[in-house]
Amino acid sequence: KGSPFDGKYKGGWNARTKAELAELSGKIDETHRYGYFYGGLVDELNKAYGKTVIKTVPLYYGQALLRAQIIDGKVPGVKKQSELYSDAMGHVSELGQRLNAYTVFAAIYGESPVGLHVPQWEKSGDTVLRAQGLSLQKAAWVAVQAVPVALERKDY
């Protein structure tokens, strides 16, 4: 059914539109780092050390990207945004845990998780689950590439 609490937008996790998701995710450019203050803080610290010593993992942005795909009906086996969460407080479900794991992998290794096989998340012959995993992997990689402080930079 979805969460009864979803910030200033009423109606549960499924109430968000793609425009609202974009507003929540923040702009991603050189002047407005991922819509929150940590991006600027990470840049400051990395510049102070002259190299990348801290990176961020854009879990929320990956979730926002996946939610937009769910709205468009492009995530196999997933019908509602609320399937990404396990409760009204925004804790992630198994689906969200998989997305977060791929996002962490991409941020740590600086490599795309697309095509990564995780046996415990795959069932032999389950093409929907495999296609769903591919959607999660792609969202994770797009999120990590889009957030400048998620990848190692050479310009400090």
Language model features with spans:
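Solvent-exposed loop/turn segments at secondary-structure junctions
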Residues: 1-6, 61-66, 91, 107
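Short acidic/His/Gly/Ser-rich catalytic and metal-binding motifs that mark active-site loops
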Residues: 3-9, 66-69, 76, 112-113
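Substrate-gating cap/lid alpha-helix
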Residues: 8-61, 80-98, 129-133
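Generic hydrophobic, helix-prone segments enriched in Leu/Val/Ile
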Residues: 28, 60-67, 140-143
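Conserved catalytic region of serine esterases and O-acyltransferases that act on ester linkages
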Residues: 48-54, 73-156
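A contiguous binding-surface segment within folded domains or other stable secondary-structure elements
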Residues: 55-77
